[in-house]
Amino acid sequence: DKEVAQIMQKYDLEAVPVVNARGKLVGRITIDDIIDVITEQAEEERQLMSGIVTDVEEDDSVWTLSKARLPWLIIGMVGGLLAAQITDLFSADIKIIAGLALFIPLIMATGGNVGIQSSSIVVQSLAVKNAFADGIGKRLMKVLVVALVNGAVLSVLVFGSVLLIFQDQSLSYTVAIALFAVVLLASFMGTVTPLVLDNFGINPALASGPFITTANDLLGLAVYFSVAHLLYSL
């Protein structure tokens, strides 16, 4: 059913013929027949992107709703604990340069948002089976160019803002360089992760929710503090 729905969506068809093993026409599938499949598929992907691992309805029991939501909430909590560990590793740097702590939310939020944007586009492409239409190399190159442009714009803006507000050139360079690196890495992860999941037969919509957000939060923190440690030790 899902394969038929994808074909009808891709080619904008109103009906698809049905033939038997001998190639004889035995009927047809219309858009009215397939609309429920499309709706169900969209709902399933929306729930996965929200971190709900099983198909649930609002009139289900409290325990059923809780079981569907808890797994990714627990994973998010574990991610938060790991983020605390990463921060603790660089606590000495934070004590010396207190301003570093002020930009942790900015780095984490930007990485998460960029990753979700990239993964959502890939998941949408995979849904209609055209993610590889132009070849994986061309897609990754386009992602890289977009990330370079967005990273450059955001880095210039944040550099000017930090310099204007805090009058600290070293801090401005640190935040700007880290933000640029985070945008590049988050874009790459957001693009590659759904493709890898799809290749292993796992619904790629998983990569558009808490998974990619948590992963990019950790990645962003590690990059940010590594850049800060490197620049301030020079």
Predicted regions and their residues:
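Hydrophobic alpha-helical scaffolding
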Residues: 56, 72, 112, 182-183
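Hydrophobic, small-residue-rich transmembrane alpha-helices and their short perimembrane loops
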Residues: 86, 100-117
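Non-transmembrane, extramembrane segments of multi-pass ion/lipid transporters
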Residues: 33-66, 117-140, 195-201
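Hydrophobic side chains within alpha-helical segments
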Residues: 36, 72, 120, 219-220
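Hydrophobic alpha-helical transmembrane segments of multi-pass small-molecule transporters/permeases
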Residues: 69, 89, 103-109, 175-180
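Generic detector of multi-pass transmembrane helix bundles and their immediately adjacent loops
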Residues: 78, 84, 89-93, 97, ...
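Residue-level signature of catalytic and energy-coupling elements of molecular machines
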Residues: 27, 70, 115, 203, ...
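Cytosolic regulatory modules rich in charged/polar residues
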Residues: 1-102
